[in-house]
Amino acid sequence: MKVKEETLKNLGDGVVLRPVDHCSSIWSMKMNMKNFLKKLHISPNQSDEAEGSISTTKSNHHKSIDVSSSSSPRSHHSNSPEIKPFSGLSNWLSSVGHRKIPSPPNSFNAKNRAATVDDTVVVNGSEHVDLGSKDPAVEEENQIQLALELSAREDPEATQIEAIKQFSLGSCAPENSPAELIAYRYWNYNCLGYDDKILDGFYDLYGVLNASSAERIPPLLDLQGTPVSDGVTWEAVLVNRSGDSNLLRLEQMALDIAAKSRSVSSSGFVNSELVRKLAILVGDYMGGPVVHPESMLRAWRSLSYSLKATLGSMVLPLGSLTIGLARHRALLFKVLCDSVGVPCRIVKGQQYTGSEDVAMNFIKADDGREYIVDLMGDPGTLIPADAAGLQIDYDESAYSASPGDNDSIHVASSSNGIESSYEENTEFRTGEHRSSTKSSGERNQSGGGGDLIVHPNISREDVKNQKKVEKAPFQNLSSRPIHSFTHMRSPSWTEGVSSPAAQRMKVKDVSQYMIDAAKENPRLAQKLHDVLLESGVVAPPNLFSEVYPQQLEATVESKNSTEAKKERGKDLETTQEGRHQNGFGPVRFLPPLPRVQSKTNAHDQRDNGKVVSQSDSSHSEASSTEYARTVPAAVAAAAVVASSMVAAAAAKSANSDSSPIELPAAAAATATAAAVVATAAAVSRQLELGSNSDGDDGSGGHEPQGSGDSNHGPNSGGERISDKSIGNESSKSDCDDVSDCEILWEEITVGERIGLGSYGEVYRGDWHGTEVAVKKFLDQDLTGEALEEFRSEVRIMKKLRHPNIVLFMGAVTRPPNLSIVTEFLPRGSLYRLIHRPNNQLDERRRLRMALDAARGMNYLHSCNPMIVHRDLKSPNLLVDKNWVVKVCDFGLSRMKHSTYLSSKSTAGTAEWMAPEVLRNEPADEKCDVYSYGVILWELFTLQQPWGKMNPMQVVGAVGFQHRRLDIPDFVDPAIADLISKCWQTDSKLRPSFAEIMASLKRLQKPVTGSNIPRPVPSSSSLPTEHEQKD
């Protein structure tokens, strides 16, 4: 039987279906549809509830939210309007072909859709059949209708697959506005990317609505219709410029700021200064800097109650919030950035920030780097995203269901979030976005929208015309943020991954110590920013495989400085590796293991030491030196620039009778981050000659041992200050190579992995019958100049010989097996020996260990050029089979990926760092003395320094609150006095290692007291332990 050629129309959808002329076709489609419905697990007589209901049904993957208790499911009387068994599904299927991605819940625009649904469908031109009936014939007609809709698609099979996927995801109707789509994405995924623009109609819903597991955001109309009540546990903020004059005024102010910012942008693009001004505008409008979180929280609650009572709605206009918490400020900042065309990303929630009620903004400044914008503690401060990657396991019980209660926990921690990324000159990765640092011209074409060229007469329309707001489509499941995986760093190379106990540490407020310090020091946030900015610099483009050649042109200065640097490499005869270059720990991101976002932080603290040069070269220009004095921190991403600046400063210093030049922190930080590209090629050649003068010191007393463990300290091998070479001798190093210390990878038998460090893995190995430790770098893509600098470091390390320095045996200098081979020390690190449960170290042995460490450090400080460790800590002191302590990780600190705030291991780095280093102030070799004082404290208290604090808290306590570890009464007074001297705030008052050695030797012979108090965890009173004989 043929079906008449007429249109079958679904009145709820308005979809016109094509006629089918043959029974066989109809029957085939009916059978296919039945199979399709079976796949969807939908029975033919199943009916849907009204889509306009606020209480939505539970789905597999999402949580539903009950907004109003007054709404209820629609009754199913025959004379009541209702959604027919398949009309809703048909509507949904018909939209699949037009929709690329999931959309918000089908509760949106429910009222409009319900009005268009009719109770009947025309069949054969005359019959009106109630779709709610149980008539099999009607059910078959419905199946035919669905099959016909599918057949109208270009690719029915692909459409079915997409339909099943979307249905399982609980997708929504296609009639939603772009603003609703973005609101749903922000609510569901907790983040909006650089491409996502906040439009009128966007609303941010926060709070616990019900315990259902379905994930459907309620429509705005339902939220606005909810009566004001103290019992409501959610809040909503609406962006609606047409009804929010305050928001319009703020946007106009932002446009005015953008117009004026052109004068401070040398490249013509919006720079970080504009971002700071926008942040200040947001902070000032929403209550100013947060000094007392409790007061801010009380003010917010008072304003919230007042607005709800005045407006008679639970939905508050964004512009009406003159007091704002972190999530409100972040939303306003994102809106203002969108209005002026500044790329901005916003994230919120536990996954990104460590708290459900905190939101943060990320921007890409004119240097191509990504920064977290502080809108709370010190509005306008930019913190590099890679330097805030602190990882903490939060106590879930600390967060209550009420948004008001949640507010009290992290009200002032918007910039202290836990989400970290590694963009820099590498690729930034989150689950939804991956960006690379590009040149200024390229950023205009990037996904983030790029920088906006601002003209003095800029207006709102100009901005809109120049940067059209694109309707952000719903991304697929890959847009869900990928959970961050941190490459764990152990205190010692031989100790493996960090202990679970440290990772289980619960912290209610990651920034509590910083907040306390801020009360005493209003400039704390800015200072902290400087510290983090220092530590988050990344290596130059040609260093890693993830970086592409075109990124080398990130700035004009970068390109020019690179050429100048090559020129100096041919002619410059001075060695200018200043102390600040020694920190060159490349803040590299995650190993090429899983390509996930890496969490790192600034471990390398580059000290602004003096640049001393004894050569007579004068090839640098005064202008370069002047640039070195004034270089802004934003240029730190171009590592090559810093090397050129250091060279220029050194050359000028050589021709001047005045005191040596101290470079600014930015130059030091840049050099530090340059992995093994710390200096120019000429410097590498000079270092070879400089090493010859002192390389044999102490060689006779060396005893073979091995250890290759430990995380290489941030500034170790780069600590050379000067070189004695002059004249034509420097050219001889051109022909020098590392062939005499190069080891072929094939000659090494690699065994089990014994450690996981900050820049690689450590394996136990055998080399020609000798037990060795093989430190294999995670970054195997060093080429050209970077590889040459690595070899230069190898040349320096091979010259060091001392009984208390870990023996360097050779290196594999050819990718893909770049490795360092050292002696193997079977007892591992001093840290592990001190803090293991059954410690058998008596006082006499610990005193000898302290003396060993002092001898090793005194040797490094006596080298010419001087070697400053800058990451001296008990995990970097290794113990051989004879209990002799040796210093390690002083030569390859530039290879470090992790930084002092990023460690999740039981021993970070901030715990041992000097306060001036934590504050990003100029530091010299005396910073090692402070670190040694902490090691002394460890040895004679047998406790872990700052064991109950995370690294960020240590930064605040030591660096800004001037706190020191408590020295127990049972510690020998002479030792206690020596520790106190090592911890002097003024580094000039700290003793040298020679003086420390003299003090310890006086204590070595007469050992008084046979009982050693033993520490008890979380107790100030320590029991005693009988002295063990050697």
Swiss-Prot record:
- According to its UniProt record, the EC number is 2.7.11.1
Q: Which residues form the active site?
A: 871
Bias kind Polar residues: ranges: 44-58, 399-419, 1007-1023
Reactions listed under catalytic activity? L-seryl-[protein] + ATP = O-phospho-L-seryl-[protein] + ADP + H(+); L-threonyl-[protein] + ATP = O-phospho-L-threonyl-[protein] + ADP + H(+)
Q: Where is the composition biased (Basic and acidic residues)?
A: 426-435, 458-471, 560-580
Q: What ranges does the record give for the region Disordered, renumbered to this chain?
A: 44-84, 399-474, 555-625, 689-736, 1007-1030
Residue positions annotated to bind ATP are 754-762, 775
Q: Which GO terms describe its molecular function?
A: ATP binding; protein serine kinase activity; protein serine/threonine kinase activity; protein serine/threonine/tyrosine kinase activity
Q: Which GO terms describe its biological process?
A: response to salt stress; sugar mediated signaling pathway
Any idea where the Protein kinase domain is?
748-1003
Purpose of the protein: Acts as a negative regulator of salt tolerance. Mediates sugar response during early seedling development.
Query: What protein name does the entry list?
Result: Probable serine/threonine-protein kinase SIS8
Q: Which organism does this record belong to? A: Arabidopsis thaliana (Mouse-ear cress)
Tissues expressed in: Expressed roots, rosette and cauline leaves, and at lower levels in flowers and siliques.
Q: What does its record list under induction? A: Down-regulated by salt treatment.
User: InterPro entries, per this entry?
Assistant: EDR1/CTR1/ARMC3-like_pept-like, Kinase-like_dom_sf, Prot_kinase_dom, Protein_kinase_ATP_BS, Ser-Thr/Tyr_kinase_cat_dom, Ser/Thr_kinase_AS, Ser/Thr_Kinases-Pseudokinases, UIM_dom
Q: Provide ranges: composition bias, Low complexity.
A: 613-625
- Keywords in alphabetical order, please: ATP-binding, Kinase, Nucleotide-binding, Nucleus, Serine/threonine-protein kinase, Stress response, Transferase
Q: What happens when the gene is disrupted?
A: No visible phenotype under normal growth conditions, but mutant plants exhibit increased tolerance to salt stress during germination. No visible phenotype under normal growth conditions, but mutant plants display a sugar-resistant seedling development phenotype.
Localization per Swiss-Prot or TrEMBL: Nucleus
Q: How does it assemble?
A: Interacts with UGT72E1.
Q: Which family does it belong to?
A: Belongs to the protein kinase superfamily. Ser/Thr protein kinase family.
Q: Which GO terms describe its cellular component?
A: mitochondrion; nucleus
